[in-house]
Amino acid sequence: MQELDLIIVGAGPVGLYAAFYAGMRGLSVAIIESAQVPGGQPQNLYPEKLIYDIAGLPAVTGADLTKNLLEQLAQISHRLFLGESVQKIEKEEGIFSVTTDKSTRRAKGVLLTTGAGLLKPRKLGIDNEETLANEGKISYFITSLKEFEGKNVAVFGGGDSALDWSLMLEKVAKNVHLVHRRTAFRGHEITVDRVMNSNVQVHTPYTFSNLIENELELKKIKSEESLNFSIDKILVNYGFLTNQVTLAENLEVSRNGRVKADSMMQSNIEGLYVAGDASDYPGKMPLMSVGFGEAVHAINAMTKKLEFDHPLRGGHSSSIF
């Protein structure tokens, strides 16, 4: 069985960039991803949504970000295994064995970039919700804006996703109604201002009451007042429930299910590192840009701490490519 320098678990943005950086430093690297396509949440949940907070990219869609990361990754030698679910990670005599539902691979180090784990959307909470979702009446994320062209759309939620999607939908939908159960939104102030100055119709503090064919009824919180209007589609942005899977015995996790990391992004198991939304430490910020830096930090720490049987390259790309 071939022994690698590094196995990365998770092919989201942080995992893809980590693989590139590891390869740039001269490590032999493989990435294992349970999904059939790489890219994580940006590719699989919101490929057409614009992302604004990545340095040097004023705005980029989830799909384009994935495309760029894969083009970057193509510059270095690597193996990418898709559609494989990691079952366990074991360490024996300083070497990790990573077992999936298809194979077992060995490496000197492991980097977990599994994001927030398996994601399950929070539901609207109505009786026939599953039927409406199967009919396409209710969605929890958007993979194609074309589905909403010329439609009357109601967006439920009060965070950044609900605000961002309302602005995106405004460009293609006939009407967009944003419904939030509170008077104040939880999103970034600048995004809230953009929504308030757009053609999005904001209804606060309202919640779902009833849906009969295309007639949506909202009920005002702590009031008998109601509101009715016609809709074709409902987008629910109440966030996601996560199901973090503990992949290694004795791996320390925080109360929110993320892997505890030290200042070098190493877990309590020597040689097992973590980066991105899968990690937790004091002052942690769950941002993609932060995850990129965490991955670099982890790999640099790994190159100093672990023993490799071949020389490594320096950390500046301008001296390599």
Curated annotation (Swiss-Prot):
Cofactor binding, per record: Binds 1 FAD per subunit.
Source domain of life: Bacteria
Catalytic activity from the UniProt record: 2 reduced [2Fe-2S]-[ferredoxin] + NADP(+) + H(+) = 2 oxidized [2Fe-2S]-[ferredoxin] + NADPH
Residues holding FAD: 33, 41, 46, 86, 119, 277, 318
InterPro entries reported in the protein's UniProt record: FAD/NAD-bd_sf, FAD/NAD-binding_dom, Fd--NADP_Rdtase_type_2, Ferredoxin-NADP_redctase_2
The EC number(s) this enzyme carries: 1.18.1.2
Keyword set, alphabetical order: FAD, Flavoprotein, NADP, Oxidoreductase
Cofactor annotation: FAD
Catalytic EC class: oxidoreductase
GO molecular function, one term: ferredoxin-NADP+ reductase activity
Subunit structure: Homodimer.
Protein family: Belongs to the ferredoxin--NADP reductase type 2 family.
Protein name: Ferredoxin--NADP reductase
Species per Swiss-Prot/TrEMBL record: Lactococcus lactis subsp. lactis (strain IL1403) (Streptococcus lactis)
